[in-house]
Amino acid sequence: MIGGRDDYPESGFSLPFEPGPRRMQIKRGIRILGIDDSPFSRGDRESNLVGVLMRMDGYVEMMEKEKIQVDGDDVNRAIENLFLYTGRVARIIMMSGISFAGFNICDIDALYQRIRVPVISVFEQGGSVERMIAAIEKHLDDPEKVRILRSLKPVEIRNNGYIIMANLSGIDAQSAQEIITRNTIRGKFPEAIRLADLVGKILGR
């Protein structure tokens, strides 16, 4: 049992690491909540955040939206709300990237700790965290956003012959790879975020 007496040395000092996430049992009907945002224009104060609830095979069950502040810090709260609006049945949160509505940065570890649902943040190979950090330091001077970005440890995912990247919380890389692959019909990106992206583009018109 994790956290039990046997997990600690006799001296009483805790282990110098936290146990990593265990291999996940992935059932065919597992629900995924796909997250992406809407485009916004210069001068906009808000943007839409879209949540698409679907089964692993791509069957869509529900869509919801929530407002977030441009360059704000409320995206974690908005994702929690989308999780609640869709009935708390999602067993995976899958999002497109880590930054929404400009530099509204999702803290995926904090999100996982709040809702206890594994988080997969998928993005294109070659995305530069350092460029994002430089822009935040220049325009926003927000150390918390910088801290979140520096804490990320992206892993490489091979999907349909493509290489993409993912940041993970509460899930191991092998399970994330399987979920991404099984939720992809064609191309490099899974249906959950592909559809959330399409809906977001419509709402942003």
From Swiss-Prot:
HAMAP family: UPF0215
InterPro entries reported in the protein's UniProt record: Endo_dU
Family affiliation: Belongs to the UPF0215 family.
Signal peptide from the UniProt entry: none
Organism: Thermoplasma acidophilum (strain ATCC 25905 / DSM 1728 / JCM 9062 / NBRC 15155 / AMRC-C165)
The protein's name in its UniProt record: UPF0215 protein Ta0042
